[in-house]
Every structure is written in structure tokens, then in C-alpha cells.
Swiss-Prot record:
Function: Protein kinase which plays an important role in mitotic cell cycle progression. Required for chromosome segregation at metaphase-anaphase transition, robust mitotic spindle formation and cytokinesis. Phosphorylates ATF4, CIR1, PTN, RAD26L, RBBP6, RPS7, TRIP4, STAT3 and histones H1 and H3. Phosphorylates KIF11 to promote mitotic spindle formation. Involved in G2/M phase cell cycle arrest induced by DNA damage. Inhibition of activity results in apoptosis. May contribute to tumorigenesis by suppressing p53/TP53-induced cancer cell senescence. Phosphorylates RPS6KB1.
Post-translational events: Autophosphorylated. Phosphorylation at Ser-206 is required for its activation. Phosphorylated upon IR or UV-induced DNA damage. Phosphorylated by CHEK1 and CHEK2. Interaction with APBB1 down-regulates phosphorylation at Thr-210.
Residues bearing the modification Phosphothreonine: 202, 210
Annotated region described as Interaction with ARHGAP33, ANKRA2, CDC42, PRDX3, RAD26L, RBBP6, RPS7 and TRIP4, given as residue ranges: 1-44
Name of the protein this chain belongs to: Serine/threonine-protein kinase Nek6
Region (Interaction with APBB1): 267-270
Keyword Glycoprotein among UniProt keywords: no
Annotated GO CC locations: centrosome; cytoplasm; nuclear speck; nucleus; protein-containing complex; spindle pole
Gene that produces this protein: Nek6
Enzyme class per UniProt: transferase
UniProt site positions, description: Autoinhibitory: 108
Domain annotation Protein kinase: ranges: 45-310
Cofactor list: Mg(2+)
Chain spans, region Disordered: 1-31
Length: 313
């Protein structure tokens, strides 16, 4: 394949990844008339602008020249990642996205290796994310109406329920990973830290994710399961109501932050602005013992009921 490096960091090779992803070959529009072809190349895209970046990746808004659809093109410098685990996470992200098919989850479209980079083609959600909406309301010194909170939260719960039903845990649910389309549809993205669990085990021990949203069992690497996503959902629901994380204030002091998380020490939500049901659900999700947190089916059911109730009042 053109552009492959002559030597590789320990733990991976282009040939190994090409075996995982499949060989690149010219697109065949007749084979997939309504979608991107199975293997694209950079020549099939007109890149417009950079819209995001990570430690080893950059995300661009691009147009697919095959069908003129606007997409997100994530370019990952996979061969510059010195640690094999980071490379495995990128391949894992592709595997997770392939399994998931839900209107509230960013859709995987294609992937290919070119110019020593792994290119992942994703559905574009171009109207911003939940963190931007929270910042906007905070700047305006306004609270988000409860009906709006449930409108978005119920969609997020639907996405997480789909993931959990496929034995996939997100592991980094936070406002910045909850994208919103121009028509108000939630799209949960950034599955790079997600972990696929077999039916035999639901425990993992690696410390990943965003500290403000990490549950006590995750911080201490004592083993955790899908209930850690429930903790993060509770933190996100709280932040939509309070306009800040429940454990905000100790970003520069990890020890103090961990203490707050262990003790579930966070300010109460204003009872005069939000329903008892919302505050109750937050406290159920942000609970120190994962065995006593509700599952995603329960959280989603409450969200659906509250969405219907607040929409009709």
C-alpha cells in the first residue's frame, strides 16, 4: 500500500491493521448506490475545515465526492502511537461503531489507511454539542428549562440502552461527547474509549475517561461494569440542571476531587426550578455503590415518562 512506513513501532504494523480493516480498493458506486462504498480513499473526499483534534487525531468536515454527502473525517496518526494499547483502541473504535446502529449514535461509514494514517469516516453532527449549550445558558445566566433537559436526556438514554444491549460500554459519557444536530437530534459519539464486554465478563480495570464523570470504583480501579455509565449519566443530568459538574471546583487537585466523588459530596439541585423526579434520578445514579444504581432500562423509562410529562405541561 502506498505510503506505508518502512519500520513500525513495537506492537503493530500496517499489514496487521490492513488485515483488520480489509484492503483498500477503488470505490464501486454500483455496489452501494445509497451509501459510501466499502473502501474509500482520500481522493474521494473534499476536506473543508478542521473541526476537532485529539492527542493523536484530527477531525475534519469533508464532502464525499461519490454522493456529495457531508461527513466527518477522523485522521488518526496510528503509527506514531508508541503504545500498542492506543493503536488497539483505534481499531476497537471501528469495531464498536460497526456493531451499533441507532439514530442517536454517530454512525460509522467507512475506514481506510492512507498516508500512514488511519482514516475513519463518520456521520457529521454539525450543530455543536451539549457542553456548548450548557456554556451558552451559563453565559446568559439562565437555567435550561426542564422540558429541554428531558428532551435531550431521553435521547441520550436511548443511545446508551442500545449500547448496553450490545454489551458495549461507553466509558466517557460527558457533555462534550453528546453532539446535537441542527434539528435537535442527539448523537452520542467518541467511542474510542468504549470497551466491548463478552457475555462472560462485565468487569474491567483500566483507568480511562474524564475525572469529573468517573465513578468511585473507576478511580480506584477496583473493577467496574455498565453501572459506571449510569454514574456518568447522573453527572450529566446534574450538569444540565446546575450548569456545572456536581464535583466541579477541584480540577487542579485530583486528590480532593477523588474525595468528593467517593463521598458523593455535591451541592443539591435547586428544588424550586427542577422536579423531585429529576433530583431523585440524579441521586440514584450518583450513588457510591454501583450495585445500588439503577440500570439503563430504568433510567430510560424515567426519562421517557418525564419527557412526556414536561412536554405536555
Amino acid at each position: 500500500m502506498a505510503g506505508q512506513p518502512s519500520h513500525m513501532p513495537h506492537g503493530g504494523s500496517p499489514n496487521h491493521l490492513c488485515h483488520v480493516l480489509g484492503p483498500a480498493h477503488p470505490p464501486d458506486p454500483q455496489r452501494h448506490p445509497n451509501t459510501l462504498s466499502f473502501r474509500c480513499s482520500l481522493a474521494d473526499f473534499q476536506i473543508e475545515k478542521k473541526i476537532g483534534r485529539g492527542q493523536f487525531s484530527e477531525v475534519y468536515k469533508a464532502t464525499c465526492l461519490l454522493d456529495r454527502k457531508t461527513v466527518a473525517l477522523k485522521k488518526v496518526q496510528i503509527f506514531e502511537m508508541m503504545d500498542a494499547k492506543a493503536r488497539q483502541d483505534c481499531v476497537k473504535e471501528i469495531g464498536l461503531l460497526k456493531q451499533l446502529n441507532h439514530p442517536n449514535i454517530i454512525k460509522y461509514l467507512d475506514s481506510f489507511i492512507e498516508d500512514n494514517e488511519l482514516n475513519i469516516v463518520l456521520e457529521l453532527a454539525d450543530a455543536g454539542d451539549l457542553s456548548q449549550m450548557i456554556k451558552y445558558f451559563k453565559k446568559q445566566k439562565r437555567l435550561i428549562p426542564e422540558r429541554t433537559v428531558w428532551k435531550y436526556f431521553v435521547q441520550l438514554c436511548s443511545a446508551v440502552e442500545h449500547m448496553h444491549s450490545r454489551r458495549v460500554m461507553h466509558r466517557d459519557i460527558k457533555p462534550a461527547n453528546v453532539f446535537i444536530t441542527a434539528t435537535g437530534i442527539v448523537k452520542l459519539g467518541d467511542l474510542g474509549l468504549g470497551r466491548f464486554f463478552s457475555s462472560e465478563t462485565t468487569a474491567a480495570h483500566s483507568l480511562v475517561g474524564t475525572p469529573y464523570y468517573m465513578s468511585p470504583e473507576r478511580i480506584h480501579e477496583n473493577g467496574y461494569n455498565f453501572k459506571s455509565d449510569i454514574w456518568s449519566l447522573g453527572c450529566l443530568l446534574y450538569e444540565m440542571a446546575a450548569l456545572q459538574s456536581p464535583f466541579y471546583g477541584d480540577k487542579m487537585n485530583l486528590f480532593s476531587l477523588c474525595q468528593k466523588i467517593e463521598q458523593c459530596d455535591y451541592p443539591p439541585l435547586p428544588g424550586e426550578h427542577y422536579s423531585e423526579k429529576l433530583r431523585e434520578l440524579v441521586s440514584m445514579c450518583i450513588y457510591p455503590d454501583p450495585n445500588h444504581r439503577p440500570d439503563i432500562e430504568y433510567v430510560h423509562q424515567v426519562a421517557k415518562q418525564m419527557h412526556v410529562w414536561t412536554s405536555s405541561t
